[in-house]
């Protein structure tokens, strides 16, 4: 067995250890977590956070960087790596497909390397972490990105290796778009609404009350998922 074959086999075993459970409740949690509708309030709050705290002259540029991050992550995954690498998803892998648990029969597309969901999640989170510069915000959104990514393995549509590579790519692209933002605005002294008080504002000038509101919506979304999973059929 070559080193690559050994790595692939280890990835299969790790994936199967995460994939699925005997709990209908956790299957429902995963199903709700992957629902776009659940996260609409959080997305709106994130946009509100930017509008309230980014200098009006630079707001459009920041929003452009958000869009650019999503486009780069998505296209690099779907248009470059997946058709180039041709790595089958766990639900399509003939060696393990009969052992993979799915939710409501969803199996995804043919190829899964690397995970666009993981790349997008970590790309956006990285960009926001660098923009907001708040410890608790950073921890909360990183946890969100990790869960959002690993659930793709839980429902059987990505190997753990797909997730790890996607997360790394996302972090790099999020850092890259933030670097572009810094490059464009390097001579703008007013790019942040900077204030002296570290109690009321983050180091980049974001109001902590707005950050707290974002975190409340995030944990509120978690609560909706956990409670809603009790009633989902």
Task: Identify the meaning behind each predicted range.
Residues 34-50, 64, 117-120, 140:
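Hydrophobic alpha-helical transmembrane segments
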Residues 37, 64-76, 80, 164, ...:
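Hydrophobic, lipid-facing residues on alpha-helical transmembrane segments of integral membrane proteins
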Residues 41-50, 67-71, 213-228:
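Hydrophobic core of alpha-helical transmembrane segments in multi-pass integral membrane proteins
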Residues 47-51, 73, 77-86, 129, ...:
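Membrane-water interface at transmembrane helix exits
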Residues 101-233:
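Membrane-embedded catalytic cores of phosphoryl/pyrophosphoryl-handling enzymes
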């Amino acid at each position: 067995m070559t080193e690559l074959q050994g790595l692939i086999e280890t990835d299969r075993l790790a994936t199967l250890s995460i994939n699925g459970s005997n709990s209908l409740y956790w299957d429902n949690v995963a199903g709700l977590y992957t629902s776009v509708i659940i996260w609409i309030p959080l997305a709106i709050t994130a946009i509100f956070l930017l509008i309230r705290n980014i200098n009006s002259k630079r707001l459009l540029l920041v929003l452009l960087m958000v869009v650019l991050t999503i486009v780069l992550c998505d296209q690099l995954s779907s248009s470059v790596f997946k058709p180039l690498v041709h790595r089958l998803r766990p639900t399509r892998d003939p060696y393990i497909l009969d052992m993979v648990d799915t939710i409501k029969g969803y199996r995804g597309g043919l190829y899964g390397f690397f995970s666009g969901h993981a790349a997008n999640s970590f790309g956006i989170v990285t960009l926001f972490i660098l923009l907001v510069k708040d410890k608790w915000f950073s921890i909360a959104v990183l946890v969100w990105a990790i869960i959002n990514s690993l659930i793709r393995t839980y429902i059987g549509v990505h190997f753990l290796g797909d997730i790890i590579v996607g997360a790394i790519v996302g972090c790099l692209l999020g850092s890259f778009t933030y670097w572009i933002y810094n490059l464009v605005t390097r001579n703008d002294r007013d790019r942040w609404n900077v204030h002296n008080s570290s109690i009321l504002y983050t180091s980049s000038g974001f109001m902590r009350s707005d950050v707290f509101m974002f975190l409340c919506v995030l944990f509120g979304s978690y609560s909706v998922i956990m409670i809603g999973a009790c009633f989902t059929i």
